[in-house]
């Protein structure tokens, strides 16, 4: 009994478990605590889903044509430092300028012996199977 009051623990089937905490203000009385008090947010309205009043601001957009043609703007990932300077075209690999930046090619435009053809064919068959199986009843 004395250890129960002193240490605030009881013997349970699983082992020693916390029972109640001692209240230092009142000696000898035990105080049961519940969950912690919910934090109060500044500018928040009462109720669920209250939005704070802080608004996000957009990043600064560079409009200087000299900087836009000599630096890769917005590529620097560090807080401090400069943007990456652009190199001459001869220093970049050749495949970089051969990339298809437009819409993807259709099956008729691709060579049947290429890997891209078979990947595209497999993707279209998966899309077709998903469309057909969406309407099936269980």
From Swiss-Prot:
InterPro entries: Ribosomal_mL54
Oxidoreductase in keyword set: no
UniProt GO molecular function: RNA binding; structural constituent of ribosome
Principal place of residence: mitochondrion
Subunit: Component of the mitochondrial large ribosomal subunit (mt-LSU). Mature mammalian 55S mitochondrial ribosomes consist of a small (28S) and a large (39S) subunit. The 28S small subunit contains a 12S ribosomal RNA (12S mt-rRNA) and 30 different proteins. The 39S large subunit contains a 16S rRNA (16S mt-rRNA), a copy of mitochondrial valine transfer RNA (mt-tRNA(Val)), which plays an integral structural role, and 52 different proteins.
Family: Belongs to the mitochondrion-specific ribosomal protein mL54 family.
Protein name from the UniProt record: Large ribosomal subunit protein mL54
Lineage, top ranks: Eukaryota, Metazoa, Chordata, Craniata, Vertebrata
